[in-house]
Swiss-Prot record:
Cofactor(s) essential for the protein: a divalent metal cation
Any single GO CC term annotated in Swiss-Prot or TrEMBL for this entry: cytoplasm
Lineage start: Bacteria, Pseudomonadati, Thermodesulfobacteriota, Desulfuromonadia, Desulfuromonadales
Keywords: Cytoplasm, Hydrolase, Nucleotide metabolism
Pfam families reported for this sequence: Maf (PF02545)
Alphabetized InterPro entries for the sequence: ITPase-like_fam, Maf-like
Protein name as catalogued: dTTP/UTP pyrophosphatase
Family matches, as SUPFAM superfamilies: ITPase-like (SSF52972)
Family membership noted in the UniProt record: Belongs to the Maf family. YhdE subfamily.
Task of the protein: Nucleoside triphosphate pyrophosphatase that hydrolyzes dTTP and UTP. May have a dual role in cell division arrest and in preventing the incorporation of modified nucleotides into cellular nucleic acids.
Active site (UniProt): D83 (proton acceptor)
Localization in the cell: Cytoplasm
């Protein structure tokens, strides 16, 4: 359960917290000028039988946000959780265990389209309100030769990435087209997350008087 807002210290009443260690998610938020703290979640990433990929991504996003929000020592009001998965033929592709696993994943994606699904959750610690959803992007890979696959693996980029590639890196050279959100493939559906933060009163991205973060005073 979420911490009782009435028992939260006063200095917990403002601020955004990203419950993720992903540098890519941090870069996306920072790139639009949002101020936030990073507190990686320790929530277990376990699968549930008969769960759809979308349900899986949303559930894990909520778990991550809730786990960090429930830590009494963590300061902040709005908590962002996210989980990104790559799905090919209804099979979820995680992060490659080793070079052979990466080669198998890339070979299975070669010359085909697949889906990248990012779940996201934004939790307001004070009101207890939670907003969560998932965004799907279709990614098309060009046909890759075995030499290209091995060369890409040698760069080290596939490791630590769901599906064994990074669209924001060298992997972009393998992807002629996508249908949907680019930032979703990077790891965070930025448009939807920022819109949710605005609805919950955490940011004012397009306010003429900015500041970006609602809890900060406007410039004199």
């Amino acid at each position: 359960m979420m911490s009782d807002p009435n028992n939260a210290p006063q200095d917990h009443d403002s601020g955004i917290v990203l419950a993720s260690a992903s540098p890519r998610r941090s870069q996306l938020l920072a790139g639009v000028g949002i101020a936030f703290d990073v507190v990686p979640s320790d929530a277990p990433e376990e699968s549930v039988p008969e769960e759809t990929p979308q349900q899986h991504a949303i559930r894990l996003s909520l778990l991550k946000a809730r786990e960090v929000a429930n830590r009494p020592e963590v300061k902040g009001r709005w908590f962002i959780g996210s989980d990104t998965i790559v799905v090919r033929d209804a099979t979820i592709l995680g992060k490659p265990r080793d070079a052979r696993d990466a080669a198998d994943m890339l070979g299975s994606l070669s010359g085909r389209s697949h889906c990248v699904i990012s779940g996201y959750a934004v939790l307001d610690r004070i009101t207890g309100k939670e907003v969560a959803d998932a965004v799907t992007t279709v990614v098309r890979f060009r046909k890759l030769t075995d030499e290209e696959i091995q060369g890409y693996i040698a760069t080290g980029e596939p490791f630590g990435k769901a599906g064994a590639y990074a669209i924001q890196g060298i992997g972009a050279c393998m992807i002629p087209a996508i249908e949907g959100s680019y930032t979703n493939v990077v790891g965070l559906p930025l448009c939807e997350v920022v819109e949710t933060l605005e609805r919950l009163g955490a940011v004012r991205l397009f306010a003429s008087d900015r500041p970006l973060c609602a809890h900060l005073d406007p410039p004199a």
